[in-house]
């Protein structure tokens, strides 16, 4: 970046990264250990998938509601509520032993986490200019990758000496610690936050005016939302079942299969920086950039299908899956993090952030049980082929949205 980043911007970036880290630690921990949970509870993947589906459905619906509410109340307060409720849900999961009760608790957990992303985007968009926003949103996104790397690398070792329930309790403790850090340090970093939640001082000029959204933008919006649903199917659908794929296809031990999943998480962390750079320096259009990345996902998914059919290599499979997930996280960065900021003039950044992010979890809610069922009935070859089909559809809808999105950028958001 050409602009010097101030200490305050760095502080905002890394504090919100911790918040997002806590969200992932307390949200995906059960999914990371689901292979071990299936083994301990002696249940099929499809039977326990309802727990993950409950979270994703609640998270998706909650995103919309939290986005609307997030434009009306202080983002800082909303983040406190979300972290506190998520910590309570993780503690409650320690004591739950029936699938029904676990589903209820994890569904409430989804609601808790839905209260975090819209206020994060609103705080960043109302406080930072475009260049600082790009710097910050990449760092915030790192929080998800760091949490994923930590869970996938540490859980296999911990599962050898303790129950998965104990690990979830540890995650709750981490969430409570970060909650206290947020309460203490956010006061200093967002000291000028007004009653409506706007941070004054370094606020971009275009946030202070409210303009109606042109009607033609709803066409590319619908296409973008479809693209987000498709990337959600790939992101969570692929990530959640990597350990099962490795365990069932290559006979890798459950704990080792979980550990191998850390490789895609490392690739994803690097991808945030790479795709942000490509977007700013090369494509300069987040929707077209997403189309290109969907094309990359299609190529890698096709290669994965060929490897699965002919070579049966665990190492190569992990590397290709890592590239698929890295691509999908790049799409997520473009469509979930960058696109909502283009609506700053409407004064509804949190609303659009919640709406778009909800689409991710519509896709995830569909993909998690569907991929599990396809794998059980038709095998992993057909499951991998479905990834390629989804990537192709994502490429098509993003390309379809590009012309009107360019017009929207030119006439509204960049004007």
Short names for language-model regions:
Residues 140-190:
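Helix-loop-helix hairpin linking two adjacent transmembrane segments in secondary transporters
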Residues 343-378:
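A late C-terminal transmembrane helix in Major Facilitator Superfamily
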Residues 61-99:
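Conserved MFS/SLC helix-loop-helix module at the cytosolic interface between two early adjacent transmembrane helices
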Residues 72-82, 280-295:
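Cytoplasmic membrane-interface "Motif A"-like loop-to-helix N-cap segments
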Residues 286-335:
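C-terminal transmembrane helical hairpin of 12-TM major facilitator-type secondary transporters
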Residues 63-74, 272-284, 375:
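Helix-to-loop junctions at the C-terminal end of transmembrane segments
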Residues 30-32, 219-272, 332:
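Extracytoplasmic gate region of multi-pass secondary transporters
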Residues 105-144:
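Cytoplasmic helix-loop-helix junction between adjacent transmembrane helices
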């Amino acid at each position: 970046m050409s602009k010097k980043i101030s200490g305050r911007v760095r502080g905002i970036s890394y504090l919100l990264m911790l918040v997002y880290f806590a969200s992932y630690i307390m949200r995906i921990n059960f999914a990371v250990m689901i292979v071990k949970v299936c083994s301990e509870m002696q249940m099929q993947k499809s039977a326990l998938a309802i727990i993950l589906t409950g979270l994703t459905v609640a998270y998706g619906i909650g995103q919309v509601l939290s986005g609307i509410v997030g434009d009306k109340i202080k983002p800082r307060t909303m983040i406190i509520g979300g972290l506190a409720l998520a910590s309570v849900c993780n503690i409650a999961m320690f004591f739950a032993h029936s699938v029904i009760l676990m589903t209820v608790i994890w569904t409430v957990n989804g609601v808790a986490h839905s209260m975090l992303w819209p206020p994060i985007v609103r705080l960043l968009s109302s406080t930072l200019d475009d260049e600082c926003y790009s710097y910050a949103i990449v760092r915030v996104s790192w929080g998800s990758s760091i949490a994923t790397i930590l869970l996938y690398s540490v859980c296999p070792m911990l599962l050898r000496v303790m129950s998965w329930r104990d690990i979830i309790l540890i995650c709750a403790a981490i969430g409570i610690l970060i909650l206290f850090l947020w309460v203490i340090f956010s006061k200093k970093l967002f000291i000028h936050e007004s009653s409506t939640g706007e941070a004054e001082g370094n606020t971009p000029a275009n946030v202070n005016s409210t303009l109606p959204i042109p009607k033609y933008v709803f066409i590319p919006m619908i296409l973008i939302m479809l693209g987000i649903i498709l990337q959600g199917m790939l992101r969570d659908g692929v990530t959640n079942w990597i350990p099962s794929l490795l365990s069932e296809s290559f006979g890798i031990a459950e704990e080792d299969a979980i550990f191998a999943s850390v490789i895609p998480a490392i690739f994803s962390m690097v991808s945030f920086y790479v795709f942000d750079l490509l977007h700013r320096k090369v494509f300069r259009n987040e929707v077209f950039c997403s189309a290109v990345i969907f094309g990359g996902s299609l190529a890698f998914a096709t290669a994965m299908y060929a490897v699965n059919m002919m070579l049966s290599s665990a190492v190569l499979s992990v590397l290709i899956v890592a590239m698929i997930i890295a691509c999908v996280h790049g799409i997520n960065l473009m469509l979930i993090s960058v696109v909502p900021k283009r609506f700053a003039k409407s004064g509804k950044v949190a609303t659009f952030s919640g709406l778009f992010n909800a689409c991710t979890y519509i896709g995830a809610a569909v993909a998690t049980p569907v991929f599990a069922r396809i794998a059980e009935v038709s095998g992993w070859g057909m499951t991998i082929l479905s990834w390629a089909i989804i990537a192709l559809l994502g490429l098509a809808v993003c390309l379809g949205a590009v012309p009107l999105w360019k017009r929207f950028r030119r006439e509204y958001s960049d004007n």
